[in-house]
Amino acid sequence: MFPRQILVFAALGLCFALVAGATQVSGVRRWELRRRFSFEDSFYHPPSGWESASPGEVLASRKVDVSPASIFNLGINAYQLLYRTTGLTDGEATTSVTTVLVPYNYDKDKVMVSALYEDSFSSECAPSKQLKSGHFISQNVAVAYQSLFLTTLLHEGWVVTVPDHEGPQNAFGAGPLEGHAILDAVRATINYDRIGLGSNAKVTGYGYSGGAMALGWAASLHKSYASELNVVGWAMGGTVTRMADWLRYIDGTGGAGFAVAALGGISSVDNDLQWVQDNLTPLGKIVLEKSKHSCMYKNLLEEAYKRFISDTYFQGGSTFFENSGAMYALNKYNLGEDGSKVPSAPVFMFHARNDIVVPYAMAQATARSWCQQGAQIRFTTYAGVEMGHTSAGIASLPDVLHFLRDRFNGKQWGETCQYPVVLDPWFNLFNLGESYAEFVQQLLDLLGRRIGKDDHILMAKLKKQEVP
């Protein structure tokens, strides 16, 4: 095992060990503690008249403590913003919340939006709830371990905004809604006076798996929905780009819980698929209700290898993929087919060729389609036999960081369409050395060290009369 892999699992092991040791406090069991923190939070309820607010307008704000792995508070300032956004279609008002992480000595001309994957149909799994101190790692392990990478981004001096991109109805898979929520989270972050970002601040975004699906929609809608944002790059990997194909592929496999969450999420906001919930069998009602209270891993464990899209769970399920109305509805969530929805900023896409959760071919086809329509795309194939969906999500992080740095620094892009193939990013010695330091840094961050650009770097820049 390579040193960086050891550090990754050591970091995660530390998180789990510390949390496991804290699951009983004064004789109170973990489920009892969790129940105490599941009360209704009035912050999520917008004030009267909110519907008339502009997309991205801040409706409420609060300062919060964040603990990404549910262990210690991060040494940063953090705020949560309730903001107005748009649902599936233009003019459909809704709200969401973004958690804004502000490191010390931060750059006021850079903001990075991180689309963490929830991949669930439960309100308790939203990043704003999981990042806020007081929630437990057992509720949403996915958000907890993804947030370890956030400290690396914060050490760059970037403001990082983390939206609840599924919205208040937890609409996992409802791409346009999620894209709107991401773009409006950036608007809200820039609009929030307490941070003081410039109106023309450079914007980048990153998402993997379900987060990439949401980010792909943000990239596609940027030009038509939020063209005033100075977006300089998007990074996404393991991306679902054709919803019907993915549901057909994943249902009945070990990832069947994704199908439950996605169909539940989309049908909760899309009138064209409301009939799915209206026609649930008694067993289907039980499964969907459980999904409403389960984060990703719990949902996957409980629904593994079940065929949810069948008459066993809802009437019409067995002929769902032959139903023209259902296919019309799901095809609205395909990326790369609409020439009016093409990313205008450079896009770094990456995918493991042997990904068994999200088929490689669909992501590659979308990348090529975007390229043919004038987008600037780098689609990197991780071709090593050991690279799958989970390993690619971790191994790609140094490549993602380099891309984001280059975009913020204005590095020349090169050829419009690029299709590099690498066996395995683990073998990139440049990445290996940098990552070793970064993961050690992250362990220190979890122990409460102050996070931001190091003061000696700040002083050196000031001495040279450079902008910090």
Swiss-Prot record:
It comes from the Eukaryota. Its main location: secreted. It is found in: Secreted; Secreted, Cell wall. GO terms for biological process: lipid catabolic process. GO terms for cellular component: extracellular region. One of its GO terms (molecular function) is triacylglycerol lipase activity. It catalyses: a triacylglycerol + H2O = a diacylglycerol + a fatty acid + H(+); a monoacylglycerol + H2O = glycerol + a fatty acid + H(+); a diacylglycerol + H2O = a monoacylglycerol + a fatty acid + H(+). Disulfide bonds join 125-295. The active site is at residues 209, 355, 389. This is Secreted triacylglycerol lipase LIP7. The gene is LIP7.
